[in-house]
Curated annotation (Swiss-Prot):
Region (Spacer): 178-341
Entry-linked Gene3D superfamilies: 3.30.70.270
EC number: 2.7.7.7, 2.7.7.49, 3.1.26.4
Protein name: Protein P
InterPro entries cross-referenced by the UniProt entry: DNA/RNA_pol_sf, DNApol_viral_C, DNApol_viral_N, HBV_DPOL, Rev_trsase/Diguanyl_cyclase, RT_dom, Viral_Replic_Matur_Polypro
Organism of provenance: Hepatitis B virus genotype C subtype adr (isolate Japan/A4/1994) (HBV-C)
């Protein structure tokens, strides 16, 4: 007969009328009983005959998350001009005095951050903006492009100008090597132009280079590109540098990222013959290569012959402006839109500063798309950047690990009678600058509108840009595109032209889609908080990622602290969002928990999710293990607040590990339901002296409670860890002490998931809220009783217990200003010093 919930509760000793613990508890360690219960609760049998359930409430399988919804009204969030001060260490030192080694190391890590991937895979520009919303492709393209433009304007992205130079907006850092600004009318230029026309001898390209550049701002890129670059050069070192630049530029520039800016590009004014000769024939050698590699974006409408017939006037290689002179092909021809405006503005924009960068190809390394900013804010969009290539495959980067305080440490730290407020750091990731050397690895961008549209509507016809007839220009005209562009014209106006061009952008601040970023952000905020705690000794400052909380004794004190700390952070260049500052009173909401003087509980929205989860949980139906992963994720978060904790979820974990479907029996569901509907706070540990000790051997157990000694034997020999756990349970139930000394590391770790299931559940409830102190076997007063010797008394140890705060040190003492004595070197081994109990 299946086990009823009442019986099961009684079995787990969760009811009060259980028999003496010394008899009842060892039974739960019995393997036979555990198997019988598992069979009764239907935990172990993978019933494959019934089809699996793939959806429970909102939980679907791990990889089929909810489909994002496109919102045509999305606005990109506004980014303040974020510029973290480069001398942040000095500024902190002026404020607090010398920094600790730890703080210095962390702040140096992010000034600037560096990124060294093992291998970078370059993707074609078409993959720059992901076709995430096929119905709203054009709209999504422009919204994303606008978002990228906003980021570039805010100084968060670099724009690739040429293979070796990039431009950006905002204040430069010292590690960004600026290219010197020089006007291109220098005496070398004239002779160079006339000389080139001599070499090219077919057409008067030379003299009209500049006029043409003025007219279209991007003439025939490959031809003029290398000539129109009158630019910084030390003639000695040029030879080495020009070769690669000019040669690469043919395959690269047409993709539109680098339109030539006379005042800034990294080739030189003294181009020598070979380079020029290459330019002369480039249109013959490269137009074929380009169209096959699919990168001749801006170049594709120009028949190869046109290079020779330049007397006919300027040729617009700009896809958008070409519509101006063509006849409309239909009512929905783009010509109608292009003729709406006389002046569409420049084809490209250039940043305020130009810097040298490592060689950067005209490719992207990750795709981007837009989603809602968060579930509560659907009016603003958020850019999702997919740099997952760095986390996959054999060449993946192993990201650094960093310590996050566990629940108990967090409670010990923050559970107090302080008043709290939390600060909101706006765009926290975008505070941390990246070294330009990382730019070639973190590229995003787009191939320009014509390519994007062509790729989406590729109706099996091969889009061949080789023979650029006028008909090809109108291939992209369609009713959908026309309607979308008309609507977008209202929003973006003449920016439509700018956004329809290709662009390649690299990150200047750390992006969110790289595993390095959370680590760097955590280092940054924890170092800042450490400095704040020292500067304001009466303030508790603590951070997790971009969530910074401040605590103080009284509300008035908190407000004055808030003002001075905000000013301090602003002086470092950290942007706070004053509208989002939350004042919590005495119970702090942090990391999904509510933390008050009574301890910690999960936040209300999580309790609500738990209730919904149990309401939707089907009984006697096999549930796909991927859905179980989702369920366990939620239940695992709240497990420490239940009676039986994690051990209660062990059957689910086992099932997921073996990739089997899991069937909830009514009793197991009722058991879990009861567990999760009554949550108990996790209390803060208090420091104290340990007076109660437990020890066990496989056959017996012994306790030392104050000056009393007790012992007992087990009916059958048990594994040593199980015996030690039982002894600890007896010590707790006999003495009621919250502090118990034990010499077993497994009991000490308070992870009871590896014990027999029933015993783990029961022990978790008995030992809930107990702290353990390690005592070496040789000094354990309970050692003798456990071996059956009651007569021998070892002296009771005075073992102090200090609550753990994990690896978060709240009390970093500022280093004293060093004296000028040489530091002594110690050769004594730390291991030979007399051992003291921790």
């Amino acid at each position: 007969m299946p086990l009823s919930y009442q019986h099961f509760r009684k079995l787990l000793l969760l009811d009060d009328e259980a028999g003496p613990l010394e008899e009842e508890l060892p039974r739960l360690a019995d393997e036979g009983l555990n198997h019988r219960v598992a069979e009764d609760l239907n935990l172990g049998n993978p019933n494959v005959s019934i089809p699996w359930t793939h959806k429970v409430g909102n939980f679907t399988g791990l990889y089929s998350s909810t489909v994002p919804v496109f919102n045509p009204e999305w606005q990109p969030p506004s980014f303040p001009h974020i510029h973290l001060q480069e001398d942040i260490i000095n500024r902190c030192q002026q404020y607090v005095g010398p920094l600790t080694v730890n703080e210095k190391r962390r702040l140096k890590l992010i000034m600037p951050a560096r990124f060294y991937p093992n291998l970078t895979k370059y993707l074609p520009l078409d993959k720059g903006i992901k076709p995430y919303y096929p119905e709203h492709a054009v709209n999504h393209y422009f919204k994303t492009r606008h978002y990228l433009h906003t980021l570039w304007k805010a100084g968060i992205l670099y724009k690739r100008e040429t293979t070796r130079s990039a431009s950006f907006c905002g204040s430069p850092y010292s590690w960004e090597q600026e290219l010197q600004h020089q006007t291109s009318t220098r005496h070398g230029d004239e002779s160079f132009c006339s000389q080139s026309s001599g070499i090219l001898s077919r057409s008067p390209v030379g003299p009209c280079v500049r006029s043409q550049l003025k007219q279209s701002r991007l003439g025939l890129q490959p031809q003029q590109g290398s000539m129109a670059r009158g630019k910084s050069g030390r003639s000695g070192s040029i030879r080495a540098r020009v070769h690669p630049t000019t040669r690469r530029s043919f395959g690269v520039e047409p993709s539109g990222s680098g339109h030539i800016d006379n005042s800034a590009s990294s080739a030189s004014s003294c181009l020598h013959q070979s380079a020029v000769r290459k330019t002369a024939y480039s249109h013959l050698s490269t137009s074929k290569r380009q169209s096959s590699s699919g990168h001749a974006v801006e170049f594709h409408n120009i028949p190869p012959s046109s290079a020779r017939s330049q007397s006919e006037g300027p040729i617009f290689s700009c896809w958008w402006l070409q519509f101006r002179n063509s006849k409309p092909c239909s009512d929905y021809c783009l010509t109608h839109i292009v003729n709406l405006l006389e002046d569409w503005g420049p084809c490209t924009e250039h940043g305020e500063h130009n810097i040298r960068i490592p060689r950067t190809p005209a490719r992207v390394t990750g795709g981007v798309f837009l989603v809602d900013k968060n579930p509560h804010n659907t009016t603003e969009s958020r850019l999702v950047v997919d740099f997952s290539q760095f986390s996959r495959g054999s060449t993946h980067v192993s990201w650094p690990k960093f310590a996050v305080p566990n629940l108990q440490s967090l409670t010990n730290l923050l559970s107090s009678n302080l008043s709290w407020l939390s600060l909101d750091v706006s765009a926290a990731f975008y505070h941390i600058p990246l070294h330009p050397a990382a730019m070639p690895h973190l590229l995003v961008g787009s191939s320009g509108l014509p390519r994007y549209v062509a790729r989406l509507s590729s109706t099996s016809r091969n889009i061949n840009y080789q023979h650029g007839t006028m008909q090809d220009l109108h291939d992209s005209c369609s009713r959908n595109l026309y309607v979308s562009l008309l609507l977008l014209y209202k929003t973006f106006g003449r920016k439509l032209h700018l956004y329809s061009h290709p662009i390649i952008l690299g990150f200047r601040k750390i992006p969110m889609g790289v595993g390095l970023s959370p680590f760097l952000l955590a280092q940054f905020t924890s170092a800042i908080c450490s400095v704040v705690r020292r500067a304001f000794p009466h303030c508790l400052a603590f951070s997790y990622m971009d969530d910074v909380v401040l605590g103080a004794k009284s509300v008035q004190h908190l407000e004055s602290l808030f003002t001075s700390i905000t000013n301090f952070l602003l002086s470092l260049g950290i942007h706070l969002n004053p509208n989002k500052t939350k004042r919590w009173g005495y119970s702090l909401n942090f990391m999904g928990y509510v933390i008050g003087s009574w301890g910690t509980l999960p936040q209300e929205h999580i309790v609500l999710k738990l209730k919904q989860c149990f309401r939707k949980l089907p009984v006697n139906r096999p549930i796909d293990w991927k859905v179980c992963q989702r369920i366990v994720g939620l239940l695992g978060f709240a497990a420490p607040f239940t009676q039986c904790g994690y051990p209660a979820l062990m059957p689910l974990y086992a099932c997921i590990q073996s990739k089997q479907a899991f069937t909830f029996s009514p009793t197991y569901k009722a058991f879990l339901c009861q567990q999760y509907l009554h949550l108990y706070p996790v209390a803060r540990q208090r420091s104290g002296l340990c007076q109660v000790f437990a020890d066990a051997t496989p056959t017996g157990w012994g306790l030392a409670i104050g000056h009393r000694r007790m012992r007992g034997t087990f009916v059958a020999p048990l594994p040593i860890h199980t015996a030690e756990l039982l002894a600890a349970c007896f010590a707790r139930s006999r003495s009621g002490a919250k502090l118990i000394g034990t010499d077993n590391s497994v009991v000490l770790s308070r992870k009871y998931t590896s014990f027999p299931w029933l015993l783990g559940c029961a022990a978790n409830w008995i030992l809930r809220g107990t702290s353990f102190v390690y005592v070496p076997s040789a000094l354990n007063p309970a050692d003798d009783p456990s071996r059956g010797r009651l007569g021998l008394y070892r002296p009771l140890l005075h073992l102090p217990f200090r609550p753990t705060t994990g690896r978060t040190s709240l009390y970093a003492v500022s280093p004293s200003v060093p004296s000028h004595l040489p530091s002594r070197v110690h050769f004594a081994s730390p291991l030979h010093v007399a051992w003291r109990p921790p």
